[in-house]
């Protein structure tokens, strides 16, 4: 494993990026409701729904793409999709575009998670797979903890009432590219830059060929149909659905709940609560 430490570090950076973008929705929901004048929480709920619906759609095709084209092209496309999604909304700040952006980002994230799990086993070695998987989850949690704090920082620094030009070149650029009444959109420019770095990293890196186990290879159409006929497959699906719904539902609407029922400022204490939630989950 020692000779692959650089590659492992890159994979951990991939997981960090995925989580940093994926778990920011909680702090953003109150801003989305206010800026787009959404009448109820159901309208806001379509944002995470579009994101996770993309997972359901892309999971099986992602496996087929890995079998046909290999891990590097799928990894590159996995970062390219959210790059396109984030830059679209960063440039066009409408509710329909946010829905489309979330869906496109979700497609890419599904591709990334499908390819990264077998890749980290190949790079780290079969005997270290459990440790590498736990390390990846740790990086995932750290990014989830930090992203709401990054949101609060940008909101505070880009607030028209407190923003001072010339304080920072990066902040000046973000201020120029972000609507004054929607400073949270600056996060999408940060995501775009982060994803661009990941695309370059994938482009210049040489990844080992993934040797998939027999039970990891994508099967034929008949094999999928046979799986869907098994009741335990549906029970597993239901279990994952309930877990993810509980975890993501809590984090996504926590800040909104605290604002509406307890008068908590969603841009500071609300975002901090989401950060602590992910930190404790880690």
Task: Describe each PLM feature range.
Residues 6-38, 116-117, 147, 151, ...:
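Extracytoplasmic
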Residues 25-26, 147-156, 226-279:
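Extracytoplasmic gate region of multi-pass secondary transporters
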Residues 28-56:
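Extracellular/periplasmic helix-loop-helix junction of adjacent transmembrane segments
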Residues 46-64, 275-282:
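Central cavity-lining transmembrane alpha-helices of secondary-active solute carriers
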Residues 57-96:
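Conserved MFS/SLC helix-loop-helix module at the cytosolic interface between two early adjacent transmembrane helices
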Residues 111-125:
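Intracellular juxtamembrane helix-capping segments at the cytosolic ends
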Residues 128-162:
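Glycine-rich segments within core transmembrane alpha-helices of 12-TM secondary carriers
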Residues 151, 155-160, 173, 179, ...:
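C-terminal membrane-cytosol helix-exit motif in multi-pass small-molecule transporters
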